[in-house]
């Protein structure tokens, strides 16, 4: 993820 896993 980028913002979230």
Curated annotation (Swiss-Prot):
Instruction: List this protein's GO terms for biological process.
Output: monoatomic ion transport
Q: What is its main location?
A: secreted
Keywords attached to this Swiss-Prot or TrEMBL record, sorted alphabetically, are: Ion transport, Membrane, Secreted, Target cell membrane, Target membrane, Toxin, Transmembrane, Transport
Annotated signal peptide = none
One annotated GO molecular function is:
toxin activity
Give GO cellular component annotations, separated by semicolons.
extracellular region; membrane; other organism cell membrane
- Describe the function of this protein: Exhibits unusual shark repellent and surfactant properties. Forms voltage-dependent, ion-permeable channels in membranes. At high concentration causes cell membrane lysis.
Listed name of the protein:
Pardaxin-2
**Organism listed in the record:** Pardachirus marmoratus (Finless sole)
């Amino acid at each position: 993820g980028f913002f979230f896993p």
